[in-house]
Amino acid sequence: HPVKARVAIYRAYQEYGVRHFVVDHSAELTKLIDVIPPSRNIVVIVRLAIEHGGAIYELSSKFGADIGAAVELVRAADQLGYATGLAFHVGSQCVDAQAYRLGLEMVNNVVEQTSVAPACIDVGGGFPGDYVNSPIPTIVPFLELIDQTYREMQMPTDCELLCEPGRALCMHGESLVLQVHLRKNDMIYLNDGMYGAMIEEKLGLRMPVRVVESRPFSDMVQAFKVFGPTCDALDVYPALLDLPSDIREGAWIEFQRIG
């Protein structure tokens, strides 16, 4: 994260032993200088903004420096006496492996312009999960392309290649089980919604859904509009859900792959 409070930087360094800090602007580098004495044991990682349409949710409009600014930050951090690294994030649920190649090519561009050997390169997260409306059978092609591109860059042998897998690693490890509090004709009201654990549904991802009950339900299905528990009419599931036509108060519904 390239934006941190000074007290957070201080505590991370002094109390928790953090030695890697991300920046994307000179003002954030100034914070580090004020709080942490320069040392080659401290790695200042410069985050690049990457423009690519392969993710359902981009992050570079909020975070990241362009190549010119990144070059200046790397040079400044190196001259101050910090070790340096480079990072990017392709965005959430990236379905195009070429985005990682583009990011690594941008990293290589910065390295060539600065002639500063990076201590690490972080390709971020964004590795896709397998959803009902976004099937990704395996992330192996993503990893293979990252490995191939990184080898072509011929970085120093002591440069660490890092990544931050999220949903691709843990999505199958958690389900959200919600209870029906009320059925009103073709509408049902659940005990969590868009302002809670269901927020990612707003991104258009559709988790597998099933009713988990010991009692039998009808084999006939019906499309329901699903609301969360708040008073806000925007707290509504963005798609109709096909559920047993006789579903009623007290039933439990499992939303899978929510990790």
PLM features per residue range, with description:
Residues H1-C120, L145:
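Active-site-proximal beta-alpha core segment in soluble small-molecule metabolic enzymes
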Residues S26, A49-E51, H89, G124, ...:
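Anionic group-transfer/hydrolysis microenvironments
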Residues A55-E58, D96-Q98, Y131-S134, H172-E174, ...:
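Short, well-ordered secondary-structure micro-motifs
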Residues V90-S92, I121-Y131, C163-A168:
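Glycine-rich beta-strand-to-loop/alpha-helix junction loops that act as flexible
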Residues L145, E160-G259:
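Charged (often Lys/Glu-rich) extended helix/loop segments that serve as interaction or gating elements
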